Amino acid sequence: MKRQSLETIHLDKIVGGGQALGTLADGRKCFVWGGLPGETVTVRITKKKSHLVEAVVEEVISPSPDRIQPRDPDSYLSTSPWQIMPLEIEQAHKRQLIDDAFTLHNVALPAAIDIYCDNVTYGYRNKVEFSWYSESVVSRAVSQKKSGQLYVGPGLFSDDTRGVNTHSDRDGLSGDTLDLAFFRRGSKGKVVVEGTSLAHPAINNLARAIRDLLRHKRVAARQLKTLLVRCDQSGSCVWQLYVKDRLPEIITADEAASLPAQGGEIIYSDPRSPASRITERLAHFGNTTLTDTILGVPFRYACEGFFQVNIPVYEQALCDMKEWVPYDCNSQHSGRQLGHHQKIIRDPREVAQIFSGVPLATDQPILDFYAGVGTIGLTIGGGNVTLVEINADAVREMQRNIAELDHTDARAVLAPSEQALDYITGKEIVIVDPPRAGLHPDVIATLLQKMPPRIIYLSCNPVTQARDVALLQQSYQIAWHRGYNFFPRTPHIEHLIILDKKP
């Protein structure tokens, strides 16, 4: 086994990927997980390249005054590496990362950067994918004795232990143990977990219940790939167990009915691929379709389907976008004024009440690229909306949502956005919510050619958004912008920009 080297360095700043940046004695840049600016740390090098290295903190020699104890000390680097800083420091770093991205591309933002956060920093995730880990009982006992490690029960992540056996079954079994796990950042190993503090408590409870059920059946991790658990805002859960062998009875119907979930599936996933892709659905239990209401509009989605992970913050982004629909070319006051911030809305009933009072212009055409299941276009787009999405499963869910909403003027288009350019006519408001890679060059070229009056651009990567805006600003100006902390305790940022055609 190749030995990983240790280095002691000083950390200077947080960079776009979310790591802290330092410099090794040989001049190479070192991108470090688990450190904060101003700290001196000992790091373990996990990846080496000619001009840079990647590392994780092994020891903090001189801690930052901003450092706090992570909620999940053993696994936070796997899921949420910014658990080591207070929320106000996290918000400041995210503002700086947005500013750095636009400065890099010579784009001047017209107002101070504001990042909306509802201050719910844990328990917000409605979807978690767990890996699995097994080792022999003897090896586990020896390693725990050497390290002094004790088994941590379910109460670490939730006070609710209903339906969970708080006594480990592993000691009474021969053979392999079975544990939930996440991949350890910076290595090929795994870290055993009882859940994650980012998740809704119902997700952790269900994951542990499935683990305990499989322990009783003496299932080993080598037979399994992953466990996907998802819940709606009420805490009702569905699950998918991805297996490497065709084992349709690994969980029976009676056993599935005993779990704290409304439904679940056993999925055979080709073991030749590390990804949890659906090769064959082996067994189905109960109702596996979830329903959530977004700004008063109900949406149905599958366990494996695309849907927002943090719905309350997403609703705020939608409220902000709605203020820029429709576009009135004769008004100097279409949309909000720079520097004005909408009231923070936390109660979903209040959101629905406010939203239902906003008149929609049914004759204002809307084109929604990278539409997912249609949560943007179908909530803020009024009647005349075209939704373009590349994923066939998402389009099927979108079509079902359109039918159930009786949205007769909405059209779902299955196509990559770069192959649906004829829908850009220059008359519609264009909404884009692309993946991290940003807009396809052909989409940008067509926008500049057809010149729609307004572009609403929501991005999960400010760096590629800034790159795209730099190209579009030859014909467009930034009317408004705002950031959103969809994923607290992680480096991920969402940023909304409203682009209006120059006079």
Task: List where the protein language model places each region.
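Extended interfacial segments that mediate partner engagement and assembly in macromolecular machines
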Residues: 58-71, 76-138, 176-220
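Terminal RNA-binding accessory module
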Residues: 1-74, 146, 165, 175
